[in-house]
Regions:
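Short periplasmic/luminal acceptor-recognition loop of GT-C membrane glycosyltransferases, typified by
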Residues: 377-415, 433, 437-445
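Membrane-interface transmembrane helices that cradle and orient dolichyl/undecaprenyl
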Residues: 150-166, 200, 282-290
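Transmembrane catalytic cores of multi-pass membrane glycosyltransferases
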Residues: 33-36, 48-53, 181-286
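Short acidic/glycine- and proline-prone juxtamembrane loop motifs at membrane-interface regions
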Residues: 134-142
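Transmembrane-helix motifs of polytopic, lipid-linked glycan transferases
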Residues: 93-113
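Transmembrane-helix signature of polytopic, membrane-embedded enzymes
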Residues: 106-129, 144
Length: 475
């Protein structure tokens, strides 16, 4: 009897929880293998086994021993722990452990507004597909959750001066500086934004801003200052404070790494991002409520980040998830609403179940097969040339690399030279002589393959079924 009363009283909460959790499981069909994941995992396993925090390179023959800004060290340890517990299922477990709490946070913060317009909630939660682009076991998924908490705490205090949640932001900052230091500046950056806007008081056509109390202004400013200090609580100290700005200021790195590329109208795969922008703009324009200036600024900042780099569209979705429901009016339920939610949730869950074997295969799939790896280990190269995207898998297999996904590490040493060599640009032959490679692991995706193929000084000693070739340099 008590159970029936509980179910009746909390019917829509239970339906939404079922829908959100099943949707997150359905999202796992987008999980994939990622080269960077493999060096994150290897670093994490090393730190767990040796009870240390890596701060100098141990994976490359070229930059071995050089200082490495391991700004994601704690994420790597966590990934290593997930691997030790879940084995080949660790990527799925890692993604679910972060995606489910994030979506539940969005639900519980907006619960009353969600219940007043369930159809819109269905549309919005379906748009979590924007989070699917980089669904793999990497530190940015932890950043997604930390960003959600940051925006929630700040907005909650902005609307409610008695809220105490904002005082958790320094702790969030410390966690961020160790899980994913490249984004650890966001708590104080957003706090400064809230501080500035708290002074504004105007009402102009569709946009308004209401001045906040002196106490709120002081708290926003103090939280920003404390968060600035907290960024430095990490194994690298003050270097972490300036790291995000140095990293984002590296134009060569930003322009050559695919996940950092700009959003482009000429790329059909980016169309959904522009549809998302239009969708939110229509919500603002058609809403009967005035647009709060703080919401507009958060929207514009998040859009700027997304347009600057496709990897930041997840940030846009997360930030707007704590804003958009305010502008949606109530809608009367029809008798089919709950059946739609339950039906879709069941479909997502069945999709996950039936695709499970393929998902597991995809998240453990490697570009370089075992035969090729064994051949490299057999020849024991001292100065192997490898492609940037293959470095993670080679590190995972205990093979020393010339370069890998840690572009921030290599940018001071050989990153530009690698780019020129791989595409046979500029004085690439002099660069090849400079590094004295003894073996080359390549495929036909880069111009360097054509050069090796047509040069008598390079002998092909292996061709793998995976499309990889090993060339040996012979004088």
């Amino acid at each position: 009897m008590k159970i029936k009363r509980f179910i009746k009283k909390n019917k829509y909460d239970l339906i939404f929880l079922f829908f959100i959790i099943c949707s997150c499981f359905g999202m796992m069909i987008f999980t994939r293998s990622d080269s960077d994941h493999f060096w994150h995992l290897t670093a994490g396993k090393y730190m767990l086994e040796n009870h240390t925090i890596l701060s100098h390179d141990i994976f490359s023959w070229f930059v071995n021993g050089k200082y490495w800004m391991s700004h994601e060290w704690l994420s790597e340890v966590v990934i290593g722990i997930f691997y030790n517990i879940f084995g080949k299922y660790h990527v799925i477990a890692f993604c679910l452990s972060l995606l489910v709490p994030l979506m539940l946070l969005i639900y519980f913060v907006n619960k009353d507004k969600i219940h007043s317009n369930k159809l819109f909630a269905l549309i919005w939660f379906t748009m979590m597909l924007l989070l699917s682009s980089f669904m793999t076991a990497r530190p940015h998924l932890i950043s997604n959750l930390l960003l959600g908490l940051t925006i929630y705490f700040l907005l909650d205090y902005y609307d409610n001066p008695d809220s105490k949640k904002i005082y958790f932001l320094p702790l969030i900052t410390i966690l961020w500086a160790n899980f994913h230091g490249g984004s650890s500046n966001l708590p104080y950056v957003f706090s400064i934004l809230f501080f500035i806007i708290s002074f504004m008081d105007f009402n102009y056509t569709k946009i308004e801003s209401k001045e906040k109390t002196i106490k709120q202004r002081i708290v926003f400013l103090l939280i920003a200052l404390v968060c600035m200090l907290c960024v430095n609580i990490n194994p690298h100290g003050f270097k972490m404070f300036i790291y995000p700005y140095i990293n984002m200021g590296n134009s060569l790195m930003i322009s050559t790494i695919s996940e950092w590329r700009n959003t482009s109208l000429s790329d059909n795969s980016h169309l959904m991002y522009y549809i998302f922008i239009f969708f939110i703009l229509m919500i603002f324009i058609l809403s009967k409520k005035k647009i709060r200036f703080i919401d507009l600024m958060l929207f514009l900042i998040s859009i700027y980040l997304g347009l600057k780099s496709i990897r930041f569209w997840s940030y846009t979705y997360i930030i707007m998830s704590f804003i958009v429901f305010y502008y949606i009016g109530a809608r009367k339920d029809d008798k089919f609403t709950e059946f739609i939610f339950i039906g879709l949730a069941s479909l997502y869950l069945l999709l996950f179940i039936f695709a499970f074997d393929r998902i597991v295969t995809n998240v453990n799939k490697k570009r370089i097969n075992a035969e090729t790896i064994n051949k490299i280990k057999e020849i024991k190269p001292d100065r192997l040339f490898n492609l940037y995207g293959d470095g993670g898998e080679l590190i995972y297999n205990n093979i020393k690399v010339f370069i890998d996904g840690r572009a921030d590490l290599y940018s001071d040493y050989n990153y530009k030279d690698y780019i020129d060599i791989s595409i046979c640009h500029s004085e690439y032959e002099k660069l090849i002589s400079k590094y004295k490679f003894d073996y080359y692991l390549v495929n036909d995706s880069q111009q360097i393959f054509i050069y090796l193929k047509n040069n008598e000084h390079y002998k092909p000693i292996y061709k793998g079924k995976d499309g990889y070739y090993i060339y040996k340099y012979e004088k």
